[in-house]
């Protein structure tokens, strides 16, 4: 199977979307948690400041608690619009930000940050001018607007419709900012909406019930239960612990002088996908095969290139004195629900 295929289906009663690239599972989105989705917007009520951290705990609907990292100048009881930025770890508050965005396939509306900006990924000057022209025709707001890279292949009508819809949503939500009680204002996008929003490159779309089984998605999901990840040169094990995600890279049966570098480069290229499919994030520690310091730069360059193409924000922290490489990855997704999947 060649090319890109987006598969929209359900796993049990859970809405799910899969992205296949040349038949290989490249990304998976499953709505398996009752927690607020990333992107959901609430009117929160400031509860108590976190001394020494500068943060603020907020009351959210349904008894949930949010944590705002920058809470300076806020007072208990004050209403505040906040947006969920990721999934909370067990026993911790939901991470939120007061920098609310309204994001769709073609447009992002940014309240409090005026101006119209076009994605740098659109490099053709004529296309940039055309996209800006569409925006100026339909966007008359004090909010800011970012035109996403997907505008390059979108039609003028679709782009204009997206801009108008996001602008109207922003106005509606901001008008409901005041109130004494916490309230859910938007739900955040589910897997099917997220697939439409984020997987914008040309692809065939399958929507028939049972497509996950017919397209081989279920078989590939079953493989995620194993920590073992085969590589073109060697293998690696990706294992989450309570404190961090541990990654161990091995050369396999190859004992040639170049084996270590080949295995490490293969692991660097494969790591974003392995983390993405498993929904793993937080602190990540990679134990590469022992190599010379001269080869470390090559591996680090390969890591940077691989994560640049990954949709989830990841910071490459660097090498530790013991030769491990550390990364910090944003918790945008919950871990893949292998227990739920096993029971189906």
What is the predicted role of each segment?
Residues 4-21, 26-29, 35-87, 93:
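S1/OB-fold single-stranded RNA-binding interface
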Residues 36, 40, 68-75, 91-96, ...:
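Ordered, soluble secondary-structure elements with a strong preference for glycine-centered loop motifs
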Residues 70, 149, 288:
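Short glycine-centered, acidic/aromatic-flanked micro-motifs in structured strand/loop junctions
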Residues 80, 180-183, 198-208, 253-258, ...:
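Long C-terminal interaction/binding lobes of large macromolecular proteins
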């Amino acid at each position: 199977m060649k090319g890109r295929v987006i598969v929209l289906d359900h796993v049990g009663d859970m809405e799910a979307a899969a992205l296949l690239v040349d038949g290989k599972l490249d990304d998976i989105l499953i709505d398996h948690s009752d927690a607020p989705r990333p992107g959901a917007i609430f009117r929160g009520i400031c509860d108590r400041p976190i001394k020494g951290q500068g943060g603020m705990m907020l009351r959210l609907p349904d008894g949930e608690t949010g944590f705002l990292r920058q809470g300076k100048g806020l007072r208990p009881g004050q209403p505040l619009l906040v947006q969920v930025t990721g999934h909370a770890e067990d026993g911790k508050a939901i991470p939120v930000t007061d920098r609310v965005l309204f994001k769709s396939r073609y447009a992002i509306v940014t309240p409090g940050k005026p101006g119209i900006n076009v994605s740098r990924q659109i490099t053709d000057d004529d296309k940039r001018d055309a996209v800006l022209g569409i925006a100026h025709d339909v966007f008359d707001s004090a909010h800011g607007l970012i035109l996403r890279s997907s505008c390059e292949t979108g039609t003028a009508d679709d782009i204009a419709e997206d801009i108008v819809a996001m602008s109207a949503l922003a106005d509606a939500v901001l008008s409901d900012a005041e109130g004494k009680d916490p309230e859910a204002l938007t739900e955040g996008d589910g897997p099917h909406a997220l697939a439409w929003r984020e997987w914008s490159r040309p692809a065939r779309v399958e929507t028939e019930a049972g497509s996950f089984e017919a397209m081989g998605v279920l078989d590939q999901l079953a493989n995620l239960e194993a920590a073992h990840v085969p590589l073109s040169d060697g293998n690696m094990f990706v294992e989450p612990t309570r404190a961090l995600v541990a990654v161990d890279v091995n050369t396999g049966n190859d004992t040639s002088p170049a084996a270590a570098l080949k295995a490490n480069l293969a692991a660097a290229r494969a790591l974003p996908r392995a983390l993405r499919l498993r929904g793993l994030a937080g602190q990540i520690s990679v134990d590469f095969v022992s190599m010379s310091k001269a080869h470390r730069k090559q591996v680090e360059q390969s890591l940077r290139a691989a994560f640049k193409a990954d949709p989830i924000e990841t910071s490459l922290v660097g090498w530790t004195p013991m030769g491990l490489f550390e990364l910090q990855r944003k918790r945008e997704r919950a871990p893949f629900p292998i227990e739920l999947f096993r029971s189906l």
